[in-house]
Amino acid sequence: MIKRILGILIPLMTCATLFAQDYVMFQTSILKLRAGQNHSLQQGVKKHNDKYHNGKDSPKAYLWYINTGPNSGNYSWAVGPTKFSDMDQSLPDDHVKDWERNVSPYADETEVVYMMRDEEMTYNPKNETVGENVLMKRIPIKNGQAHVEAVENAVQKIADVLKKTNAKIARRVYRDAFPDGHQEIMLVYPFSSWSEFEGNVRGLPEGFQNSYEKIHGNGSFRKEVMDVLSTHSDGVTHEVMTMVK
């Protein structure tokens, strides 16, 4: 937060392509809770967001509680959509002091990531930008161009099938604009109820594997998606995040 964050939960070569056109980007960070002070942190962030990130004079800010995954029990704070040019503006003293008064006593801000949306791999039929409740799948890709291309191809094929079948869900794909050591793809699936996870569904529509194999052939989903991710990534984490209002 002490960094300049009037903007805001990708590989550099891809970024170079996207920067030349309009883009959707969020600045996200993890708020690591101190001493279990959930209520105090939630109220403090709400006060700060209402005053300085209400979407009127600057990009809007959001807070999610992280229910699952390596950061479970903590919070994801995000500002956006924003542009890189927003970062050229220094925060006024009162803005910084408000954060120090309302947020810093209850949490440490870590893991700042600039998430840039990859429109080609995104399936977003209702053209939504922010989901109140989301499942975020993080895919850290192994180093090497062959690994990157293999994972990108698998993610793109899923997007193509979602489009061909007019799926009712959305899947927004983001990249880290400043990867640290390895490239990462983040898949964001909005959901309205936890009941959507019944039947071992984790974001994709019920029966998606069958839909995929009708297009690409029997056994293709395991070969072209599951085996590819197993071989070319360091695993997939699942973060279920619910918005704090």
Give the location of each predicted region.
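Bacterial Sec-dependent N-terminal signal peptides
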Residues: 1-24
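Short S/T/G/P-rich N-terminal loop/turn motif that feeds into the first structured element of a domain
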Residues: 20-245
